[in-house]
Amino acid sequence: MENYLLSSPTQLSQPYDDGTNSLLFMDNYELSQNLSQPLDQHLQSLQQQSQVQSQAPQQVQSLNQHQQLPQIQPFPTLVNNQQYAQETFQQLSQQHQQQQQQQQQFSPFQQSQLQQQFQYQYSQQQQQQHFQQPVTIEEEIVPASNNTNIQISKFFDDNKGDDEDIANSGNFNEFDHSRNISLDDTTITDLHRRENSINPPTGLPHSISSNTIYSYSSFESPQSHIQSQPSYSQGYHNQNSLSTPLRRNKSYSISSANFNQSPVNLATTAMNKIMKTPLRGHTRSRSKVDVNAAVTAAMNLGQATKSNSTSSYNSTLNPFYTPSQQLSSTDDDDISTPLLTPGTKLHTSKSTFFSPYNKDDLEDQDDDAVKQLRKAKSYTSLLRKKKREDMTPSKQNQQHQQQQQQQQQQQQSRQSGGGHIQNLSFPNSTSQPKIDLLAYDQNPMTSYPPMDKSILKNLNQSISPFNKPKLSPPPSNFPSISIDLTTIATNKSSSFSSSTTHRNYNENTPFNSANSTSGGLLPPMATFTVPTVIKEELQVHNLQEEEQEHQDEQMEIDSFESNEKNARPTLSTSSLVRSMKMANLEISNDQQMSSNEDENIVTEAVVKQEKNGPVVDDVNGTGTNSKKPRKKQKSKSKENCNKKGKVATGNGKDNDKNNECLVNKGNKTNNNDTSNDKLDNDNKNTNGNGNNDNDNDSEENNDNVDDADDDDDGTVTIPIPEDLNVTKVKVRNNRSKSNDKSDPKKKHKCPICESRFQRPEHVKRHLKSHSSEKPFECQMPNCGKRFNRKDNLKAHLKKIHGLVKGQEEFTRVLNENKEVS
């Protein structure tokens, strides 16, 4: 039962239109009885088939026969069917003449509708009789979709044109059977009522076969009977296609009878052109169906559905989906557009507008900023590489320089083995390449090997990246020795540079700030420990040279001593070395001086030191001398200077004035000497981290020397009190030094920081700032702050605690501080 013709899912999804004229005279039963003539010949064929079936099994008629109309497969041979056929044949023969007269009265549209209605009524009667009869096993109910009589030969016949196929398919497009029809209705009058269309059938199972979507072979062409064509052999080829307005057209269905055929060929030939009603204005013509996997799968399953633009199902799943079409491909191109298949949509779509997507002759623009930067960098890198190749020496020159360095090092090692080092100047200093500080990171010198990490253990100062301590790895028998590069950079004489380097070896101390900041071109470099054997040899050699220099200088010293009254004792070797170091400190490295000028400076320093008197020096350099006795000695010498100055002004003798000048000069050298002792002791006791302190001390010494020259204009230096514990050499002074020096009223000077004041009381008050003692304490609760001066305490009470002079708390704090002091 389930294989009988029912409405398809796509048909049910279509909107139902009650305003259609498809069932115009459905309720007029008498009128439908008069339209029985189209079944005359059909009933005759049924009688013949029933006789044949009684004798032998019925054979399936060929689908390629063009002489017969589409016929319904015969039902099983039943007695009731034969009797009913005879009765209906007699009734129809009597009414044959009446129908011919009525055909002239109705329009073609009404005739086609009535014929379709009568055909459906006849099929309903046949089905009702069939339900009452038992069905044997051998007898088979053939579904309507399998009984199709669509001429398949036309699909594969290449001789037939497209126009002929369209004309033949017009009869199928005109048919429209009613929807949702209940097959168990007993009366024809109740055929098309609304409740019967909505309610499901009562006697049949609700199953719909997908293979019975549309089948036109069960019904004959109504128009062929209207035109009264005598022969059916002409078939559909002689009939013209009529497009009825306001009717939905059907597409071809591929039923189960066509499964033995190739679905690909069927799709490409039969589906060339599908016509639609002219309800919609625009159209699309399909050239050929794109054969893909989706089409093949749909054809194999037999689920090719009707394509309609008003359907609600997804059109992308159906490869045969097209919008409403009516015009053919021969029409004007302005109103027809080729339908794009999914496979060729991207490849064949070409826009009429300009687009660089498929424009192959466009130039590639370098719009990317990164590409432009890379290109620019590549140009500059080529120039740098070429310049680098020009600047770097060749491998042969490098090997030649290395060989020369090794030979010189071997010669120096042999000389050091003999006990004397005659020349410790920088080896091959003139042949070394210059260091370009700007291009160092990009162009590292190949002649400079990488720094040895073991050197870092003995570093006392930071090493800059261009300050390489080793130019080449020395041989095993010659240890590394620190070299004073500042003396080499100043291009001084070989004798003077060698003497300075010898003293640096002897002292074995890191370069101080005075030595590094005196005009040198390179930053300070770290020194390294020297083995004891080489150190002893250097000491012996240095002592010999110092004795020779001492003999030469002693001759000049004797000439100065002959002019003086009091003979001075000879100086020790250590004092000579220290005096010469002071001379080196005072010489700027920017000045190109000869060896004679250096000797004159050394002799002047020695004369100044001899005039000051014998000095007890610490030869071992243990640094036991403290600051306090040194400054007491300094204050005593200044007191003597002041006393002698007063005597000189009272008596007015020239000899006393000369003595006063000598005393002042002696004080100058004494101050320099004590400051140098302090500087040496600080360098020996520190680990190289106190460079800033040394800088401050050296600047203070220079200031002291400059200020000492102003003693000639009548300034008085106040002596340091004996009970004062001096801990701060340099204190914060808000007064400007230039104003102090230029102001003639300020004739009293501090012996420690050389600050000038108008009165001696001011100097005594100022001296307390150099001491760490703070006798004045604030007695306010939760304060306890101490001050070294009373006026500072007063300012504190006034500013912090808000006490005004004359209040009880203010006076109490001051009185308590007086008692303590």
From Swiss-Prot:
Q: Which PROSITE patterns match?
A: ZINC_FINGER_C2H2_1, ZINC_FINGER_C2H2_2
- Location of the protein in the cell: Nucleus; Cytoplasm
**Compositionally biased intervals (Low complexity):** 305-318, 396-412, 662-674, 684-693
Q: Which domain of life is it from?
A: Eukaryota
Cellular component terms, GO, for this chain's entry? cytoplasm; nucleus
One Pfam family cited in the UniProt record for this chain: zf-C2H2
Q: Where is the composition biased (Basic residues)?
A: 372-387
Q: Where is this region: Disordered?
A: 42-66, 219-245, 305-432, 544-576, 607-750
The UniProt record lists the keyword Zinc-finger: yes
Identify the keywords attached in UniProt to this record, alphabetized.
Cell adhesion, Cytoplasm, Metal-binding, Nucleus, Phosphoprotein, Repeat, Transcription, Transcription regulation, Virulence, Zinc, Zinc-finger
Question: What are the Phosphoserine sites (modified residues) in this protein?
Answer: 769
Output the GO biological process annotations, alphabetical, semicolon-separated: cell adhesion; cell wall biogenesis; cellular response to cold; development of symbiont in host; filamentous growth; fungal-type cell wall organization; hyphal growth; positive regulation of cell adhesion involved in single-species biofilm formation
Name of the protein described by the UniProt record: Cell wall integrity transcriptional regulator CAS5
Q: What is the lineage of its organism?
A: Eukaryota, Fungi, Dikarya, Ascomycota, Saccharomycotina
Which gene is transcribed and translated to give this protein? CAS5
